[in-house]
Amino acid sequence: MSFVITFTSVIEIPAPSFDLAMSLDSGQVFHWQKTGKGFAGTIGDFAVYIEQNGNVLKVRDGGAPARSPRRPLPEIVARYFALDHPLAEICASFPGDAVMNTSRKFCRGLRIIRQPKWECLATFICSSMKQVAHIRQISLALRRRFGDQRRVGDQVVYTFPRAQRIARASEDDLRKCALGYRARNLLMTARLVSSGKANLEAWSALPDADLREKLCALPGVGAKIANCVMLFAYERLRAFPIDVWIERTLKQQYFPRKKKVTTLQLREFSETYFGEHGGYAQQYLFHHARTALRKSAAARDSSPAHRSARNDKGRDTRVASRKSRNRKRFLDSESACSPGHCGPFEVRGPE
């Protein structure tokens, strides 16, 4: 279904202590598209284009279909980006160790985005064993295939499909969105949500432990995904998702002398050490580690020594290919795996 909508005006929203680009690129949401100086995307059913100019967000409203209940646009945007969170107080509650301080300074202005519950749950079910770029591809594919089209100026965006729409799809249809085995989990969960057996809105009243238990009972949801949904959709700011980046960061930075640290030990440590805003601390640690690794890899690839090494390797490869192509392929495959270094963190990429 397509809705063609044009801009009506630009609305300015105060946004102190907020970094729009960093928040959208921190692994919380995956559908926003960089367009010009800003980003085009959807907040629920609403299509918007957002630019940041200092402490002000300039928002152009692409609108929503008439059937959608309409709240004032500034309220919609401010709530979505959690502009009401007392960020200075939250950061002041973090532990004062060097690792956390470095991440806090690096992530200044990053806020936990308040996401629609079904959209967040479904997206993170799709995220299992996937890197951020792949999650984005899946999210956009689901939106294009099953969502509603909007236009924000000249930019086409799509809403996230409702649970009822996914529930009517076939597993094969979902697999066409590169979901793989996750297609069945998403389909089964969508059917539970659309039937009312899993009432995501009603679960808002549950205490943390009960909410986590309810989420973990859904197909495709384990402790990590449950904590992501609790943090990003239910605003449980103590929730501390532990993925491969966080696990390695915790082990290397907080348990450097222990040869073996179990997942249970990491969970217990994170719950007590990072406190009532542990979810924010986790997001800062995650984004810092992931971003620093990318910058480190880019710097290494662009360095004169690395470029020279690549040129030398190319000459050596041409010589080797004349001797033995099979031998060359084997050596190339062996040389492709090297650990990355990311400033204060020493973190290897996903294996």
What does each of the following model-derived ranges do?
Residues 344-350:
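Short, intrinsically disordered C-terminal tails of secreted or membrane-associated proteins
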Residues 1-303, 307-318, 322-337, 349:
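HhH-family (HhH-GPD) DNA N-glycosylase catalytic core used in base-excision repair
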